[in-house]
Amino acid sequence: KELLSKMTLEEKIGQMLCFAFHGTEYNEQLKILIEDHHIGTIIHFARNIENLDQIYKLNKAIHEKSKYPMFIGLDHEGGMVRRVMEDITYLPGAMALSNATDEELYKIYNQTGKELKILGFNMNYMPSVDVNNNPYNPVINSRSYSDEPNMVSKRGGIAAVAMQDALVLP
């Protein structure tokens, strides 16, 4: 409440916005978004991530240059949707994890969350809680835990709690 009371209207509006950008280092585009428009969230895509050292430095610069705490996110749900590809625990897709115990599922998502947090991320656009109601759908298929809504809900809940416990917002 105290922080909000000190913000201008422009800063409050900026905090509600999420932007992607081009590049792999802190550049003029990011400067304008963060320092001039005070946006609240940056999302990284594969085009922004080269290696662990680079993404750590980029995220550190984003956090340091922002006047207000930033959300820095990525889409790292596992399987074919992974943005950090090297030197991080491999996270299989949801279907591949469908036979894991609840404890195993929690551990792998929590470990992934801890690794993302070390790299400067505090938001992960996951889990996918799509129900695989059409096995021929090429977009959902292996990204779903099951064709049973209750199972998808339970597994997605475990993944979300594991990320939250690693201080990464799902």
Regions found by a protein language model. Give the residues of each.
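Short acidic active-site motifs
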Residues: E28-L30
